[in-house]
Amino acid sequence: MIQENKNFATAKAKSIRVSPRKLNLVASFIRNMKVSEALIQLTFSPKRIAKIVKDCLRSAVANAENNLGLDIDRLIITKATVGKSVVMKRIMPRAKGRATRINKFFSNLDITVTEKEDN
Protein backbone atom coordinates (compact mmCIF):
# COMPACT_ATOMS: atom_id res chain seq x y z
CA MET A 1 0.00 0.00 0.00
CA ILE A 2 1.15 3.50 -0.75
CA GLN A 3 0.91 5.90 2.15
CA GLU A 4 0.13 9.46 1.22
CA ASN A 5 1.72 12.41 2.94
CA LYS A 6 -1.21 14.58 4.00
CA ASN A 7 0.65 17.68 5.20
CA PHE A 8 0.01 19.70 2.05
CA ALA A 9 -2.89 21.69 0.68
CA THR A 10 -3.64 22.89 -2.84
CA ALA A 11 -5.67 25.60 -4.51
CA LYS A 12 -6.44 26.05 -8.19
CA ALA A 13 -7.38 29.05 -10.28
CA LYS A 14 -8.71 28.17 -13.71
CA SER A 15 -9.20 30.19 -16.89
CA ILE A 16 -7.25 33.24 -15.78
CA ARG A 17 -7.21 35.88 -18.53
CA VAL A 18 -3.44 36.16 -18.90
CA SER A 19 -0.94 34.27 -21.00
CA PRO A 20 0.87 31.38 -19.30
CA ARG A 21 4.22 33.03 -20.00
CA LYS A 22 3.31 36.15 -17.99
CA LEU A 23 1.73 34.14 -15.18
CA ASN A 24 4.80 31.92 -14.93
CA LEU A 25 6.96 34.97 -14.18
CA VAL A 26 5.04 35.56 -10.96
CA ALA A 27 4.61 31.86 -10.13
CA SER A 28 8.33 31.12 -10.43
CA PHE A 29 9.06 34.16 -8.27
CA ILE A 30 7.09 32.80 -5.28
CA ARG A 31 8.09 29.15 -5.67
CA ASN A 32 9.94 27.69 -2.61
CA MET A 33 9.16 30.82 -0.59
CA LYS A 34 7.54 31.12 2.84
CA VAL A 35 3.86 31.97 2.58
CA SER A 36 4.17 35.10 4.72
CA GLU A 37 7.04 36.40 2.58
CA ALA A 38 5.22 35.54 -0.66
CA LEU A 39 2.09 37.45 0.42
CA ILE A 40 4.19 40.55 1.12
CA GLN A 41 6.00 40.26 -2.22
CA LEU A 42 2.72 39.81 -4.12
CA THR A 43 1.15 42.80 -2.36
CA PHE A 44 3.83 45.17 -3.64
CA SER A 45 4.40 43.54 -7.03
CA PRO A 46 3.73 45.82 -10.02
CA LYS A 47 2.40 42.90 -12.09
CA ARG A 48 -1.34 42.91 -12.77
CA ILE A 49 -1.62 39.15 -12.26
CA ALA A 50 -0.09 39.29 -8.77
CA LYS A 51 -3.51 40.01 -7.22
CA ILE A 52 -5.03 36.80 -8.62
CA VAL A 53 -1.99 34.76 -7.57
CA LYS A 54 -2.30 36.26 -4.08
CA ASP A 55 -5.98 35.25 -3.88
CA CYS A 56 -5.13 31.69 -4.95
CA LEU A 57 -2.34 31.54 -2.37
CA ARG A 58 -4.71 32.74 0.36
CA SER A 59 -7.12 30.00 -0.66
CA ALA A 60 -4.38 27.36 -0.34
CA VAL A 61 -3.47 28.69 3.12
CA ALA A 62 -7.14 28.59 4.17
CA ASN A 63 -7.41 24.99 2.92
CA ALA A 64 -4.31 24.04 4.91
CA GLU A 65 -5.58 25.69 8.08
CA ASN A 66 -9.24 24.65 8.00
CA ASN A 67 -9.20 21.25 6.30
CA LEU A 68 -5.91 19.84 7.57
CA GLY A 69 -5.18 21.88 10.69
CA LEU A 70 -1.68 22.88 9.58
CA ASP A 71 0.27 25.70 11.22
CA ILE A 72 0.16 28.68 8.83
CA ASP A 73 3.40 30.14 10.20
CA ARG A 74 5.36 27.10 9.00
CA LEU A 75 3.89 26.85 5.48
CA ILE A 76 6.07 27.09 2.39
CA ILE A 77 5.06 27.08 -1.27
CA THR A 78 6.35 23.82 -2.70
CA LYS A 79 4.65 23.92 -6.10
CA ALA A 80 3.30 26.72 -8.24
CA THR A 81 2.49 25.26 -11.64
CA VAL A 82 1.13 27.11 -14.63
CA GLY A 83 -0.67 25.51 -17.54
CA LYS A 84 -2.48 26.48 -20.72
CA SER A 85 -6.24 26.81 -20.75
CA VAL A 86 -8.58 27.79 -23.58
CA VAL A 87 -7.66 30.21 -26.34
CA MET A 88 -10.19 32.82 -27.42
CA LYS A 89 -9.88 33.53 -31.14
CA ARG A 90 -10.73 37.00 -32.38
CA ILE A 91 -10.52 38.71 -35.76
CA MET A 92 -8.78 42.02 -36.39
CA PRO A 93 -9.57 43.88 -39.64
CA ARG A 94 -6.54 44.77 -41.74
CA ALA A 95 -5.87 46.73 -44.91
CA LYS A 96 -7.43 45.89 -48.28
CA GLY A 97 -10.33 43.95 -46.81
CA ARG A 98 -8.23 41.31 -45.17
CA ALA A 99 -8.40 40.10 -41.58
CA THR A 100 -5.98 38.40 -39.21
CA ARG A 101 -6.67 36.23 -36.22
CA ILE A 102 -5.77 37.32 -32.69
CA ASN A 103 -5.33 34.67 -30.01
CA LYS A 104 -6.25 35.66 -26.46
CA PHE A 105 -4.66 33.15 -24.11
CA PHE A 106 -6.01 31.89 -20.80
CA SER A 107 -4.08 29.93 -18.19
CA ASN A 108 -4.51 27.74 -15.12
CA LEU A 109 -2.65 28.08 -11.81
CA ASP A 110 -2.11 25.36 -9.20
CA ILE A 111 -0.47 26.25 -5.87
CA THR A 112 0.60 23.65 -3.29
CA VAL A 113 1.68 24.62 0.22
CA THR A 114 3.44 22.26 2.62
CA GLU A 115 4.15 22.47 6.32
CA LYS A 116 7.88 22.79 6.92
CA GLU A 117 9.25 20.09 9.19
CA ASP A 118 11.41 21.01 12.16
CA ASN A 119 14.98 19.76 11.82
Curated annotation (Swiss-Prot):
Keywords of the record: Ribonucleoprotein, Ribosomal protein, RNA-binding, rRNA-binding
Cellular compartments per GO CC: cytosolic large ribosomal subunit
Matching InterPro entries: Ribosomal_uL22, Ribosomal_uL22_bac/chlpt-type, Ribosomal_uL22_bac/org-type, Ribosomal_uL22_CS, Ribosomal_uL22_sf
A Pfam family it matches: Ribosomal_L22
Molecular function via GO: rRNA binding; structural constituent of ribosome
Annotated GO biological process: translation
Assembly and oligomerization: Part of the 50S ribosomal subunit.
Family membership noted in the UniProt record: Belongs to the universal ribosomal protein uL22 family.
PANTHER family: CHLOROPLAST 50S RIBOSOMAL PROTEIN L22-RELATED (PTHR13501), LARGE RIBOSOMAL SUBUNIT PROTEIN UL22M (PTHR13501:SF8)
Function per UniProt: This protein binds specifically to 23S rRNA; its binding is stimulated by other ribosomal proteins, e.g. L4, L17, and L20. It is important during the early stages of 50S assembly. It makes multiple contacts with different domains of the 23S rRNA in the assembled 50S subunit and ribosome. The globular domain of the protein is located near the polypeptide exit tunnel on the outside of the subunit, while an extended beta-hairpin is found that lines the wall of the exit tunnel in the center of the 70S ribosome.
Family annotation (HAMAP family): Ribosomal_uL22_B
The name this protein goes by in its record: Large ribosomal subunit protein uL22
Native organism: Rickettsia typhi (strain ATCC VR-144 / Wilmington)
